[in-house]
Structures are given as C-alpha cells and as structure tokens.
C-alpha cells in the first residue's frame, strides 16, 4: 500500500499515520522528520537544508524531493509507505508522481481527512494549551488553516482527477476515523 495522507493542521494526520503504519506494517514517512534526520546526519542534502533554514528561508521542493527519493530507495518501503502531509502543492504532487513513476511505485491512494475549521481551531488550541505553547492562538491557527486551504485545495483536485482521492470524515474517536480510512481503502 502506497498512501498519502492529506489534511489541515489538527486533522489527525500524524496520529492516523502512526496507526496505519502498525495496521499495514509499512513505514510512516513525514517530510519534517526526514528533514530533521538529514540535518542531524550531516548528509549533503541535510547540509544544504541546514544552510537554507539558517537564512530563515523555506527548504526548496528540490531538496525535499531529493530527501524523499533517498528515503523511498530504502528496503523497508518495498511493500509500501504512508506519506504524511506531502505533497503540499501541485508542483510537489507532480514531482512526487514523476518520482514514483520513475521507481515503479505509483500511489495506490490519497486520503484527505476532512474536519471543520472551527473544530480544527479548538483542537490545535487545546493541544497548544496542554503543551504550553502560546504561539498557537486562535488567530494564528486560522491563518495557518487559510494557507493550507489556499495551497492544498488544488492538490486535492489533482488527485481527484486521477481517481486516487478518498475523502474521510476526520471527526470521531481514533478508532472510528481509522475504520473509515480502512473502508475508504477497501480494507
């Protein structure tokens, strides 16, 4: 199973990806985790990324794709993988499709976790309070959600046009959402 999980901040992507990893016995790949690991390892791509981040710039799609290509070349992804939160824009979606085609591992499905914006604000604000983070105030969360909507809505359409998209209601208990994802994937 080669799967992408999409959803706005607070939708439960990371939580469900961890659960799907256990269910399908395939690795959960987060580009954020990849980036941190490459920087920590001091790899050539990690050093490039560190330099970019030190300037306060965003890591380029090219660097992210290079890291992803290296990760997808590892033995543990032979039976599939779960990509969490990537691609975030249509350029990344096209690049990912090209990469997966090149290595003969096309996506099986893309799951979009749908959660109403106001509930997302509540979830993130609650999580921020529990973790003592003051930067996740409702206004900044709304801005992050708007950025997500602006950049990711076209990605949803991209995969919908290719017949790969499954929309799943992300509201409910962890087990209920996992069950819905399983049903959407025909499991």
Swiss-Prot record:
Its EC number is 2.7.4.3. It catalyses: AMP + ATP = 2 ADP. Keywords: ATP-binding, Cytoplasm, Kinase, Nucleotide biosynthesis, Nucleotide-binding, Transferase. One of its GO terms (biological process) is AMP salvage. Catalyzes the reversible transfer of the terminal phosphate group between ATP and AMP. Plays an important role in cellular energy homeostasis and in adenine nucleotide metabolism. Monomer. This is Adenylate kinase. It comes from Xanthomonas campestris pv. campestris (strain ATCC 33913 / DSM 3586 / NCPPB 528 / LMG 568 / P 25). The lineage of its organism: Bacteria, Pseudomonadati, Pseudomonadota, Gammaproteobacteria, Lysobacterales. The gene is adk.
């Amino acid at each position: 199973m080669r799967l992408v999980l999409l959803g706005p901040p607070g939708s439960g992507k990371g939580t469900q990806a961890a659960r799907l990893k256990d269910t399908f016995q395939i690795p959960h790949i987060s580009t954020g985790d990849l980036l941190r690991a490459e920087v920590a390892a001091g790899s050539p791509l990690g050093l490039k990324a560190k330099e970019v981040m030190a300037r306060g710039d965003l890591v380029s799609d090219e660097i992210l794709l290079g890291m992803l290509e290296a990760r997808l070349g590892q033995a543990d992804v032979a039976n599939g993988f779960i990509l969490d939160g990537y691609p975030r824009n249509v350029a990344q979606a096209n690049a990912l499709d090209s990469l997966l085609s090149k290595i003969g591992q096309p996506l099986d499905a893309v799951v979009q976790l749908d959660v109403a914006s106001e509930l997302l604000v509540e979830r993130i604000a609650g999580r921020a309070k529990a973790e003592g983070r003051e930067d996740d105030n409702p206004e900044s969360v709304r801005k992050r959600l708007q950025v997500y909507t602006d950049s990711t809505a076209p990605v949803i359409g991209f995969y919908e046009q290719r017949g790969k998209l499954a929309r799943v209601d992300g509201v409910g208990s962890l087990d209920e959402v996992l069950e819905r994802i399983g049903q959407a994937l025909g499991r």
